[in-house]
Regions:
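Conserved C-terminal helix/tail region of periplasmic/extracytoplasmic solute-binding proteins
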Residues: 430-488
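Extracytoplasmic/periplasmic substrate-recognition and gating elements
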Residues: 303, 329-330, 342-409, 463-466
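Secretory targeting signatures
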Residues: 1-53
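Hinge/lid segment of periplasmic solute-binding proteins
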Residues: 119-178, 208, 349-353, 415-421
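Glycine-centered hinge/linker elements that transmit conformational signals in sensory
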Residues: 211-215, 249-312, 341-342
Length: 488
């Protein structure tokens, strides 16, 4: 979905890890395995930082505490150096509080914060308070993965028109990290292939293949203690993990996906049908056969988690069993890559793959402009500057996060001062971003209503004693009924 809740890693620790990876040339590296090709190369639009008339004015930008703020501050400094009449102040607050500060200010129609930061999930909650950026910011849509832009950047109004309400600045996905050395072990792989008929290593054709690897490495051979770590935390994480699994089943069931097997309808996404109902609103898609199968698969995968399932694993700990050699893989956000690499020697064995079937889930962040700001033109110019390839590339070299720009990715890929292994990571993350369509809804009521209405009954099922089809169906029916009532 998105980096909806940041991992419990301190900023200082993250920066230290980034220094190890970027400057010292990390001992760890990611190897990307996916059947999906990169987007077609296009010419990117260059961005200038000055006009015929000198830029003047002050900007206040509010964001959450994150390593990417080092890049943001550096970009602000260079922008101000090129435009002496401009002053930019960056206000960083904790992830749990910054949205409250933003919303309180916006609801009061205050011009205090010219630029706000939001995530894929929270973006539409701000839709009524931010400016339509169409005509204000020029996007080269061929230069950024469409799923990253669609999931939080666009808002479809009731009259059918679409507004650009935010601009993504990083690429982030929810996908599979795994122990490459273990899964490619010749002896184990030979034994596995004789029994199951395919390789343990990715790409995997479906989720049953993942479950087979779990069973082989944990139950049959006792090679590791845990399987693919699958986060079923009730507070938020279920709404990320379930659609990541459900995406496969959704795309293979035209009765729910219709003509939109890779993403569904804008803002509704895959947890609603890929087509509108008679009222013009799509119905929930997950309470049918495809959704039930996905939920039962999630239950089965969580049996290979640290127990009791649903209480031990969360955003801040999902990578720990993999990092410590106790699990063969983890379903997690790419933003956690620095944490996953923090502990050698196993860090050198960690690789990343797309989800079974060759897709991923999106989890990026956005900058939006306060519609009550008195400096909207200047704010748009600064955002344009941040996504220009040369500036956007520095989000990796300064902060260890991954650029949204394809041209920025190419700049980094050709930079011989960056270790080849690290360059593989950069390209890998961009590639998963291009297929990050397996997303939950990002409607205005997603955070306040839809997430708890879904997570609560699903958590009860996941932590229950039965994986029966009827129990799964009942949980999904309960969630679907609540969604129908909420959405209309």
């Amino acid at each position: 979905m998105n980096k909806k809740t940041r991992s419990a890693i301190s900023t200082a620790a993250s920066i230290a890890i980034i220094v190890i990876i970027i400057i010292a040339g990390a001992a760890a590296y990611l190897y990307y395995s996916s059947t999906t090709s990169s987007p077609t190369t296009t010419t990117t639009t260059t961005t200038t930082t000055s006009t015929a008339q000198p830029l003047t004015g002050s900007l206040n930008l509010i964001t959450f505490t994150d390593p990417s703020n080092a890049w943001l501050q550096a970009a602000a400094d260079s922008f101000m150096a090129a435009n002496p009449g401009v002053h930019i102040t960056i206000v960083a607050q904790g992830f749990s509080s910054y949205t409250t500060t933003e919303m309180t200010s916006l609801q009061a129609q205050s011009p205090t914060y010219d630029i706000i930061t939001d995530t894929s999930t929270s973006a539409l909650g701000f839709a009524n308070y931010v400016s339509n950026l169409n005509g204000k910011v020029t996007l080269n849509t061929a230069d950024m993965p469409a799923p990253q832009l669609n999931f939080g950047g666009y808002y479809k109004l009731a009259n059918g028109t679409t507004e650009l309400i935010g601009v993504p600045y990083d690429t982030a996905t929810f996908t599979i990290f795994y122990n490459q050395t273990l899964l490619s072990n010749p002896t184990l792989n030979s034994q596995f292939q004789k029994e199951y008929g395919f390789s343990m290593s990715p790409p995997w054709s479906n989720w049953q293949a993942i479950l087979d690897v779990d069973n082989f490495l944990v139950t049959q051979t006792h090679t590791v203690k845990y399987g693919l770590i699958t986060d079923g935390s009730q507070s938020h994480d279920i709404i990320d993990t379930y659609p990541a699994i459900y995406g496969y089943y959704y795309s293979h069931d035209s009765s729910v996906s219709g003509s939109n097997p890779n993403g569904g309808l804008l803002n509704y996404n895959i947890m609603f049908n890929g087509f509108a109902g008679s009222s013009g609103i799509p119905a929930p898609s997950f309470n049918g056969t495809a959704g039930t199968q996905a939920l039962q698969m999630m239950y089965n995968l969580m049996q290979y988690d640290p127990q009791p399932a649903g209480t031990t694993v969360n955003y801040g700990t999902v990578f720990a069993p993999l990092q410590q050699g106790e699990a063969w893989g983890a379903l997690m956000f790419t933003a956690d890559a620095p944490a996953a690499f923090a502990q050698p020697p196993l860090s050198s064995s960690i690789a990343v793959s797309s989800l079974p079937g060759g897709y991923a889930e999106t989890g990026t962040d956005f900058y939006a402009i306060n519609k009550y700001s008195n400096n909207q033109a200047l704010a748009a110019t600064f955002i344009q500057y941040l996504i220009s390839p040369s500036v956007n590339a520095r989000i990796y070299t300064i902060a260890g996060e991954f650029p949204i720009s394809k041209a920025a990715t190419a700049i980094l890929a050709s930079n011989s001062s960056i270790p080849q292994q690290a360059r593989n990571v950069i390209q890998a993350v961009f590639n998963t971003g291009a297929v990050g369509w397996a997303n939950p809804p990002n409607l205005t009521i997603t955070s306040s209503t839809l997430i708890p209405a879904f997570n609560n009954p699903i958590y009860t099922f996941l932590t229950g004693s039965t994986n029966s089809t009827s129990a799964a169906q009942q949980a999904l029916d309960t969630a679907a009924a609540a969604w129908i009532k909420a959405v209309g």
